[in-house]
Amino acid sequence: MQTILSFLSSLSERIGRALRSMLRLPSLPAGDLLHDRNYRRIFASVIITHFGAQITMLALPLTAATVLNATPTQMGFLMAAEIVPFVLLSLPAGVWLDRVRKLPVYVVGESVFALTLATVPIAAWTGVLSMTWLYVVGFVLGCVHVFGGTAAQIVLTQIVSRERLVEAHSKNALAVSGSEIAGPGLAGALIKLLGAPIAIAFDALL
């Protein structure tokens, strides 16, 4: 287990270095928004978050199906657990975020997201993983998406000037599209190589 975690940590560090190197390419036009260090961090976060989401999107239900032999009904409940927070909390989250600082919410959300994901491979390794566990994980991840995702959008408007918001949103959309195109294939290979629960650990490290 320690060897696998060391491998995942090393791999995530290499991906991070490659991404940082890519974002420092001298070929960028002089006025490109990526020259802004604060925006670069947001942009890198978008790529990493959405690539990791492709892993979890495949690995979480596969963990339920292959490790816990989940029934179709249980798989439906797992999907519902991730969706319910959007239905119940979207409006309250918006009202609450109007009254608090957004960046700490985003940072805490990312930390909770990583810690929640990390419980899945640990629970699988120790033999205590259950469908109830996965339901809770799915619900917490959904809550993080509601609060953290909304906060991230607001943080972007605070970092980037109004005149450059269209450019920022365009770049972010491109990053999301690229992650969604390349992510599933890479996620599938990672799951096949390491197994679904350990692949989730990789997303947690990202």
Segments (PLM) and residue ranges:
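Alpha-helical transmembrane-bundle signature of multi-pass membrane transport and export proteins
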Residues: Q2-L206
